[in-house]
Amino acid sequence: MKETPLSNCERRFLLRAIEEKKRLDGRQTYDYRNIRISFGTDYGCCIVELGKTRVLGQVSCELVSPKLNRATEGILFFNLELSQMAAPAFEPGRQSDLLVKLNRLLERCLRNSKCIDTESLCVVAGEKVWQIRVDLHLLNHDGNIIDAASIAAIVALCHFRRPDVSVQGEEVTLYTPEERDPVPLSIHHMPICVSFAFFQQGTYLLVDPNEREERVMDGLLVIAMNKHREICTIQSSGGIMLLKDQVFRCSKIAGVKVAEITELIQKALENDQRVRKEGGKFGFAESIANQRITAFKMETAPIDTSNIEERAEEIIAEAEPPPEVVSQPVLWTPGTAQIGDGIENSWGDLEDSEKEEEEEEGGIDEAVILDDTKMDTGEVSDIGSQGAPIVLSDSEEEEMIILEPEKNPKKIRAQTSANQKAPSKGQGKRKKKKRTAN
């Protein structure tokens, strides 16, 4: 199912709002949407909400044989799925261009940046290593999928615990969580993607674009960075040309946003760990606020209405008057008038239908009698079967008879007179029969 395209009015409205440095949800140009992180009952399961965009992250592991060229390193695998539950435009089981681009960007952001120590995932060199699989499911799409997916992936990896193992000779022993505590992954840093949307060929910039803003943007710049201000990857799409100063400015903004998001992630991990140690309630069910009626509500957007009247007066004063202004009504026909800029009014003349309506309102209900028409070939007298002239009234139920002239009007006259005499003779015979019967 294809997505519903934006109308021209919506597109112009969005672009006009961006030019005035306003956004539909009330944010400023460099503001991020609210980020909410909730953890499941198992380690390595989390849901990240970036506004209305929701991504579910799940990490799993298994012992496999290593790659031939990297015998002492573990394997990282990332998989992002776009289901129709998130948006009707996504087709299940099909590798779209958007899905391929997002998966490659996640691999460059997390795997190529060496954020996880893959050598610590080795159990037996050349024989057994841990394969870490990160599955990401998009639950709801409201724009900026890559930022929400990168946050969900790194949060799930930080929250994940793998089973402990021991090696004695050639025997590898795998312990359950009851026998030994699971072991967390060795993470060097936390790279996070920050997206920048450009409009009007790079003139205007927005951070964290939503779904509607992504439809009207000209290009997208994604910068993956950690809290140490180290750029892990950078990608530009959309075919726009960016200046060096624009890229530097975006990198500075990304550094500030990444530091804030990293602090939020660390606090969420610490709170979850504290609740688990204290034996409190945790999981997705506990993170839903079910005691509030307005748990799911639209955030209010403040609007400044202080200078609306002054602005309206300025617009009226700056507006240019039309070239020709008519201050008095222009009489086109009797009973009509027009006040405007002097353009000829095509509605000035009364039409036939309006004349008929006026005659009906005035009480003129006289019948229209068709007179004998005079043709070039001769005169034709239109007489009915009983010698009475044909009368057309205003009633819509009666049939209308259209008389067409013939080539020989004298023959038509003779035929009509013969038809009139014939029924008169028949009527006389009927009267005689009635008298004899009596």
UniProtKB/Swiss-Prot annotation:
Question: Where are the membrane-spanning stretches?
Answer: none
Organism whose genome encodes this protein:
Mus musculus
* UniProt function note: Non-catalytic component of the RNA exosome complex which has 3'->5' exoribonuclease activity and participates in a multitude of cellular RNA processing and degradation events. In the nucleus, the RNA exosome complex is involved in proper maturation of stable RNA species such as rRNA, snRNA and snoRNA, in the elimination of RNA processing by-products and non-coding 'pervasive' transcripts, such as antisense RNA species and promoter-upstream transcripts (PROMPTs), and of mRNAs with processing defects, thereby limiting or excluding their export to the cytoplasm.
Which molecular-function annotations from GO does this UniProt entry contain? mRNA 3'-UTR AU-rich region binding; RNA polymerase II-specific DNA-binding transcription factor binding
Q: Which family does it belong to?
A: Belongs to the RNase PH family.
Q: Where is this cross-link: Glycyl lysine isopeptide (Lys-Gly) (interchain with G-Cter in SUMO2)?
A: K297
Residues recorded as bearing N6-acetyllysine in the entry: K297
- Stretches with biased composition (Acidic residues): 349-364
Q: At what positions is Phosphoserine found?
A: S65, S306, S346, S393, S395
In this chain, composition skew of type Basic residues spans 427-438
What does the annotation say about its assembly with partners?
A: Component of the RNA exosome core complex (Exo-9), composed of EXOSC1, EXOSC2, EXOSC3, EXOSC4, EXOSC5, EXOSC6, EXOSC7, EXOSC8 and EXOSC9; within the complex interacts with EXOSC3, EXOSC4, EXOSC5 and DIS3. The catalytically inactive RNA exosome core complex (Exo-9) associates with the catalytic subunit EXOSC10/RRP6. Exo-9 may associate with DIS3 to form the nucleolar exosome complex, or DIS3L to form the cytoplasmic exosome complex.
User: What InterPro entries has UniProt attached to this entry?
Assistant: ExoRNase_PH_dom1, ExoRNase_PH_dom2, ExoRNase_PH_dom2_sf, Exosome_comp_Rrp42_subfam, PNPase/RNase_PH_dom_sf, Ribosomal_Su5_D2-typ_SF, Rrp45
GO cellular component terms, A-Z: cytoplasmic exosome (RNase complex); cytosol; exosome (RNase complex); nuclear chromosome; nuclear exosome (RNase complex); nucleolar exosome (RNase complex); nucleolus; nucleoplasm
Instruction: Kindly state which keywords UniProt assigns to this record, in alphabetical order.
Output: Acetylation, Cytoplasm, Exosome, Isopeptide bond, Nucleus, Phosphoprotein, RNA-binding, rRNA processing, Ubl conjugation
Linked residues for Glycyl lysine isopeptide (Lys-Gly) (interchain with G-Cter in SUMO1): K297
GO biological process: what's one of them?
nuclear polyadenylation-dependent rRNA catabolic process
| Gene field | Exosc9
What is the protein name stated in its UniProt record? Exosome complex component RRP45
